[in-house]
From Swiss-Prot:
This is Glycine--tRNA ligase. PROSITE patterns: AA_TRNA_LIGASE_II. PANTHER family: DNA POLYMERASE SUBUNIT GAMMA-2, MITOCHONDRIAL, GLYCYL-TRNA SYNTHETASE/DNA POLYMERASE SUBUNIT GAMMA-2. Its EC number is 6.1.1.14. Substrate binds at residues 101, 151, 198-202, 305-309. ATP binds at residues 183-185, 193-198, 265-266, 309-312. The gene is glyQS. It is found in: Cytoplasm. One of its GO terms (molecular function) is ATP binding. GO terms for cellular component: cytoplasm. Its main location: cytoplasm. SUPFAM superfamilies: Class II aaRS ABD-related, Class II aaRS and biotin synthetases. The lineage of its organism: Bacteria, Pseudomonadati, Bdellovibrionota, Bdellovibrionia, Bdellovibrionales. Keywords: Aminoacyl-tRNA synthetase, ATP-binding, Cytoplasm, Ligase, Nucleotide-binding, Protein biosynthesis. GO terms for biological process: glycyl-tRNA aminoacylation.
């Protein structure tokens, strides 16, 4: 058997639409550039991705959760530097009207040429702010300007004192959040890799100055282990240190994943020093120092940040999990089984119920079994086409187990359970099925 892994992102885009992972937003109107909707399977899987990250963070004894507002006081973004500095250099081609970023387009950097048509008839570089601006209230004037947040992190900083005092946590401790952010990207693309509306999963870990470098190392290791735990292959991951640091950073490293278009950033891990809290102290006039009671001293905490895009991680899980198993029979005919080898905690459905026939005696048992399993798991029910085609459908969407109800079930009250990856089958009593599936999910890859 030959194994082929994903080489072309278009293969995944097609599968995502066909199976209900991701749809083009507003498709009946021709779509809206780089905006995507998560379908029946995608919404389930995305929830699982967020739950995996959330549990990894907030089930620790030193991290609390936060759900901050998307709209914030505009001075937040002045203090953070976004109003004055959150921009990309933009260039227009006067021939083909293409717009592109000047700082990451090779043909422009090397030869001052348009990446689309090759023309050198280009505009001067100009700064383009990436924040979406809107107005709050009935009047559209300068006093009503607000922004759709470009990151969730600032909610952590302005709520640092609230969270610390309400939870009574002592430093070191963290604040975790999942939420929508918006950036008016010049060149979005590569499916859901870079979009203008996206969901972030960020954690800010507040530490005493002088301990920051050690915690930075620890969080690098923890985040790497998170990806390995949920099934991403080590050879598809690497760390990349930043050559040039952002204005707020003392140190920065990216976790990169090998997407079909090459290694690209999956998560950023940053030592933000005391920049953010210091800035908000300066602009708000509020004292955000932390008082260390045992040592009787005050300081502005340093911050270790971990920031990953949920949509980008969703894409990485699909890219990493996709495989084609190619077998050849004696006549030389090839057969291809497409498998989405997702970790069970990430897969949209944990189990599928497949009655061998649509006859009433099997359907009634199967529907009761579906309801029994649904008390503990996300369950798919499928009774159309041959059992072989139904197995293939479940393989393609990543369902770890298929439960087949056959005519023997009527007498022995047992079902056949099929393992997605091993394709082994086992007969299990209906009364033991929930416990069996739960146990097997925990040891699925062993």
């Amino acid at each position: 058997m030959k194994i082929k892994h994903l080489e072309d992102l278009n293969t995944l885009v097609s599968l995502s639409k066909r199976r209900g992972f991701v749809f083009q937003s507003s498709e009946i109107y021709g779509g809206l550039g780089s905006c995507w909707d998560y379908g029946p399977l995608g919404s389930l899987m995305k929830l699982n991705v967020k739950r995996a990250w959330w549990n990894a963070m907030t089930r620790r004894p030193d991290i609390v959760g936060l759900d901050a507002a998307i709209l914030m006081h505009p001075m937040v973004w002045k203090a953070s530097g976004h109003v004055d500095g959150f921009s990309d250099p933009l260039v227009d081609c006067k021939e083909c009207k293409t717009r592109f970023r000047a700082d990451n387009t090779d043909s422009y950097i090397n030869e001052k040429k348009c990446p689309n048509c090759g023309s050198k008839n280009l505009s001067e570089e100009r700064s383009f702010n990436l924040m979406f601006k809107t107005h709050m209230g009935p009047l559209e004037d300068s006093g009503s300007v607000v922004y759709l947040r470009p990151e969730t992190a600032q909610g952590h900083f302005v709520n640092f004192q609230n969270c610390q005092q309400a939870s009574r946590y002592k430093i070191p401790f963290g604040i975790a959040a999942i939420g929508k952010s918006f950036r008016n990207e010049i060149t979005p693309g590569n499916f859901i890799f870079r979009t203008r509306e996206f969901e972030q999963m960020e954690m800010q870990y507040f530490v005493e100055p002088g301990t920051d470098e050690q915690f930075f190392k620890e969080w690098k290791e923890r985040r790497w282990n998170f990806y390995i735990k949920f099934g991403i292959k080590p050879e598809n991951l690497k760390f990349k240190d930043h050559d040039k640091l952002a204005h707020y950073a003392k140190a920065a490293v990216d976790v990169e994943f090998k997407f079909p278009m090459g290694f690209s950033e999956l998560e950023g891990i940053h030592n933000r020093s005391d920049f953010d809290l210091s800035q908000h102290m300066k602009f708000s006039g509020k004292n955000l120092e932390y008082f260390d009671e045992p040592n009787k001293k005050k300081y502005i905490p340093y911050v270790i940040e971990t920031a990953v895009g949920c949509d980008r991680l969703f894409l990485a899980f699909l890219c990493d999990a996709y495989r084609e198993e190619v077998t050849t029979d004696e006549a030389g005919k090839e057969d291809v089984r497409v498998v989405m080898g997702l970790h069970p905690e990430i897969a949209p459905f944990k189990v599928a119920v497949l009655p061998l026939s649509k006859k009433e005696e099997l359907s009634s048992i199967s529907e009761k079994l579906r309801d029994q399993l649904a008390e503990d798991f996300d369950v798919n029910y499928d009774e159309s086409q041959s059992i072989g085609k139904r197995y293939r459908r479940q393989d393609e969407i990543g369902t770890p187990f298929c439960v087949t109800v056959d005519f023997d079930t009527i007498n022995d009250q047992a079902v056949t359970v099929r393992h997605r990856d091993k394709m082994t089958q086992e007969r299990v009593a209906i009364t033991q099925l929930n416990a069996y599936i739960a146990a097997k999910l925990k040891t699925f890859n062993q």
